[in-house]
Amino acid sequence: MENTLGLEIIEVVEQAAIASAKWMGKGEKNTADQVAVEAMRERMNKIYMRGRIVIGEGERDDAPMLYIGEEVGICTQPNADQLCNPDELVEIDIAVDPCEGTNLVAYGQPGSMAVLAISEKGGLFAAPDFYMKKLAAPPAAKGKVDINKSATENLKILSECLDRSIDELVVVVMKRDRHQGLIKEIRDAGARVQLISDGDVGAAISCGFAGTNVHALMGIGAAPEGVISAAAMRALGGHFQGQLIYDPEVVKTGLIGESKQANLDRLSSMGINDPDKVYDAHELASGENVLFAGCGITSGNLMQGVRFFHGGARTQSLVISSQSQTARFVDTIHMAGQPKTVQLH
């Protein structure tokens, strides 16, 4: 899969990032997201595959494209019988976030990315549009920290695993009212807190790389992004755990349903009979071959954002493979055409 689709999915996230970056700083988060969705879908439909969106822009009735269940790729087109050889057909599941951090793009802030994860059919957890409690940590702490432990306990373990004092550790937490107690506990334990307004996928993945100065991600964020983070962290050998949040009182916002019981009923209808289950990276991204791809829209901890020049753009992308256990950074110059001749006076 890596050999056949690796470069293709890099181009998918590159095109989404370039489209969205044109709206950077214009205060139009919905437009920044919309153009990224359109660009991502257009490029996906040029790939020789039969892809199915398992995590996307929402339910079919709420999203015109890249909705959950939508099929993409050349082999889903009306004339697929003429274009595709069934013996060569690649069937994959896809999780997408064409503009991870729409507010970051709209206000010109760092850390937004176009991201996706793919696996063979059935290889990605089809997370509902709920919240998820998350814990990400470096490979050295894999299986040693635990989401059921307190932040204080996990920081002590992390300190030992990384051979660092607690006051050297940096924990990323989303700046939300629900995290006030968590933030206080982390600070009281002696660690430093980096607050982010949006975009916890990049924060989770940063834990998998040495030198990013991010040692853990803690707190509650969106579940679909948790699956994408898990796909990357699984390939990196890092620690990732997620637990679905089905009680609206925990987050006091409208991303999940109106009542706890309604959410439990929805989970049951999806075949999730243990709503309190803690999932690890292998359970969220269980496929034999899992690929993650991301491209910076605005510059962040991992990647430079899109930089435009006359007649083109420059992007920095990242592709991570569970099969080859590699992470490749890709620096690309996109040349739209020959530069115009400018006459100086």
Swiss-Prot record:
<dbReference type="InterPro" id="IPR004464">
    <property type="entry name" value="FBPase_class-2/SBPase"/>
</dbReference>
<feature type="binding site">
    <location>
        <position position="57"/>
    </location>
    <ligand>
        <name>Mn(2+) 1</name>
    </ligand>
</feature>
<dbReference type="GO" id="GO:0046872">
    <property type="term" value="F:metal ion binding"/>
</dbReference>
<feature type="binding site">
    <location>
        <position position="225"/>
    </location>
    <ligand>
        <name>Mn(2+) 2</name>
    </ligand>
</feature>
<dbReference type="GO" id="GO:0019253">
    <property type="term" value="P:reductive pentose-phosphate cycle"/>
</dbReference>
<protein>
    <recommendedName>
        <fullName>D-fructose 1,6-bisphosphatase class 2/sedoheptulose 1,7-bisphosphatase</fullName>
        <ecNumber>3.1.3.11</ecNumber>
        <ecNumber>3.1.3.37</ecNumber>
    </recommendedName>
</protein>
<feature type="binding site">
    <location>
        <begin position="198"/>
        <end position="200"/>
    </location>
    <ligand>
        <name>substrate</name>
    </ligand>
</feature>
<feature type="binding site">
    <location>
        <position position="97"/>
    </location>
    <ligand>
        <name>Mn(2+) 2</name>
    </ligand>
</feature>
<keyword id="KW-0464">Manganese</keyword>
<keyword id="KW-0378">Hydrolase</keyword>
<comment type="pathway">
    <text>Carbohydrate biosynthesis; Calvin cycle.</text>
</comment>
<feature type="binding site">
    <location>
        <position position="131"/>
    </location>
    <ligand>
        <name>substrate</name>
    </ligand>
</feature>
<dbReference type="GO" id="GO:0042132">
    <property type="term" value="F:fructose 1,6-bisphosphate 1-phosphatase activity"/>
</dbReference>
<feature type="binding site">
    <location>
        <position position="100"/>
    </location>
    <ligand>
        <name>Mn(2+) 2</name>
    </ligand>
</feature>
<dbReference type="GO" id="GO:0050278">
    <property type="term" value="F:sedoheptulose-bisphosphatase activity"/>
</dbReference>
<feature type="binding site">
    <location>
        <position position="33"/>
    </location>
    <ligand>
        <name>Mn(2+) 1</name>
    </ligand>
</feature>
<keyword id="KW-0113">Calvin cycle</keyword>
<comment type="function">
    <text>Catalyzes the hydrolysis of fructose 1,6-bisphosphate (Fru 1,6-P2) and sedoheptulose 1,7-bisphosphate (Sed 1,7-P2) to fructose 6-phosphate and sedoheptulose 7-phosphate, respectively.</text>
</comment>
<feature type="binding site">
    <location>
        <begin position="176"/>
        <end position="178"/>
    </location>
    <ligand>
        <name>substrate</name>
    </ligand>
</feature>
<dbReference type="GO" id="GO:0006094">
    <property type="term" value="P:gluconeogenesis"/>
</dbReference>
<comment type="subunit">
    <text>Homotetramer.</text>
</comment>
<dbReference type="GO" id="GO:0005829">
    <property type="term" value="C:cytosol"/>
</dbReference>
<dbReference type="GO" id="GO:0006071">
    <property type="term" value="P:glycerol metabolic process"/>
</dbReference>
<keyword id="KW-0119">Carbohydrate metabolism</keyword>
<dbReference type="Pfam" id="PF03320">
    <property type="entry name" value="FBPase_glpX"/>
</dbReference>
<dbReference type="GO" id="GO:0030388">
    <property type="term" value="P:fructose 1,6-bisphosphate metabolic process"/>
</dbReference>
<comment type="similarity">
    <text>Belongs to the FBPase class 2 family.</text>
</comment>
<feature type="binding site">
    <location>
        <begin position="100"/>
        <end position="102"/>
    </location>
    <ligand>
        <name>substrate</name>
    </ligand>
</feature>
<keyword id="KW-0479">Metal-binding</keyword>
